[in-house]
């Protein structure tokens, strides 16, 4: 699926290595391969944005390598494609050799897969399913500040789905582990690929059912109920967490204004 770039190739350029992405001047490069000195390099076409190809190159530069988080305020579709590129680059890097027999792997031609010619094993990009849930209690929403967040943002509860769990079971378990609360009326809202490092966020709304709030200090710095019109600092627009909070606020406005 990789091809050697020519002077006539152009589009958006996702240049990634070890979870970092090349962002000259803080933006995803756009233009011709010649303009960005990419002629002759091998690239994968991973999608299309605004009628132009999006290319992935698995290499690094000495400067301007950054986190794909810097693109979170860009258009959602472009951020998603950049995240795809970062995840694929990491997949190619971490699957150069077969985990069963140790022989070199090669890329498939029809799909994103790494193949072992020696033992015929096939490896696909890892995707970690996660649940993220906004919990409403009358005109309040549960928000928490996570230990991993250093910028004072308050958000909703989330966690990884474990082996053998349904999404509903994962939501109930994560909520109880982090807050000691039980919920009801769980309903699916939307999903969002989240390349940190390779998650798929599945978003839900829920209503409080029972329990006294007691946050897990290993996961959360604090957690509390916030009235819908008196909220702390929130996640940025474009994140699925922000979408859930805004949906919950809208429900509160309908019922309490």
UniProtKB/Swiss-Prot annotation:
Keywords: Hydrolase, Magnesium, Manganese, Metal-binding, NAD, Zinc. Divalent metal cations. Mg(2+) or Mn(2+). A motif (Nudix box) lies at residues 159-180. Pfam families: NUDIX, Zn_ribbon_NUD. SUPFAM superfamilies: Nudix. Substrate binds at residues 69, 111, 124, 192-199, 241. A divalent metal cation 1 binds at residues 158, 178, 219. One of its GO terms (cellular component) is cytosol. It catalyses: a 5'-end NAD(+)-phospho-ribonucleoside in mRNA + H2O = a 5'-end phospho-adenosine-phospho-ribonucleoside in mRNA + beta-nicotinamide D-ribonucleotide + 2 H(+); NAD(+) + H2O = beta-nicotinamide D-ribonucleotide + AMP + 2 H(+); NADH + H2O = reduced beta-nicotinamide D-ribonucleotide + AMP + 2 H(+). Disulfide bonds: none annotated. Its EC number is 3.6.1.-, 3.6.1.22. Belongs to the Nudix hydrolase family. NudC subfamily. mRNA decapping enzyme that specifically removes the nicotinamide adenine dinucleotide (NAD) cap from a subset of mRNAs by hydrolyzing the diphosphate linkage to produce nicotinamide mononucleotide (NMN) and 5' monophosphate mRNA. The NAD-cap is present at the 5'-end of some mRNAs and stabilizes RNA against 5'-processing. Has preference for mRNAs with a 5'-end purine. Catalyzes the hydrolysis of a broad range of dinucleotide pyrophosphates. This is NAD-capped RNA hydrolase NudC. It comes from Edwardsiella ictaluri (strain 93-146). The gene is nudC.
């Amino acid at each position: 699926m990789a091809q050697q770039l020519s002077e006539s190739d152009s589009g958006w350029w996702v240049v990634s290595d070890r979870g970092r992405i090349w962002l000259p001047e803080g933006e995803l490069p756009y233009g011709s391969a010649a303009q960005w000195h990419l002629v002759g390099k091998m690239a994968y076409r991973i999608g299309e944005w605004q009628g132009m190809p999006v290319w992935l190159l698995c290499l690094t530069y000495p400067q301007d390598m950054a986190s794909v988080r810097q693109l979170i305020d860009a258009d959602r579709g472009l951020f998603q494609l950049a995240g795809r590129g970062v995840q694929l680059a990491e997949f190619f890097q971490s699957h150069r050799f077969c985990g069963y027999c140790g022989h070199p792997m090669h890329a498939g031609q029809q799909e994103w897969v790494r193949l072992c010619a020696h033992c015929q094993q096939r490896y696909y990009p890892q995707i970690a399913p996660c649940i993220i849930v906004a919990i409403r209690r009358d005109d309040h929403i549960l928000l928490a500040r996570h230990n991993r967040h250093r910028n004072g943002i308050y958000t909703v509860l989330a966690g990884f789905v474990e082996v053998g769990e349904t999404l509903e079971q994962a939501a109930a378990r994560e909520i109880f582990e982090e807050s000691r609360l039980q919920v009801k009326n769980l309903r699916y809202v939307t999903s969002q690929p989240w390349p940190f490092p390779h998650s798929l966020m599945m978003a839900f709304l829920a209503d409080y059912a029972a329990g006294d709030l007691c946050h897990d200090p290993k996961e959360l710095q604090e957690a509390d109920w916030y009235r819908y019109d008196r909220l702390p600092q929130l996640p940025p627009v474009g994140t699925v967490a922000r979408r859930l909070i805004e949906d919950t606020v809208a429900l509160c406005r309908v019922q309490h204004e």
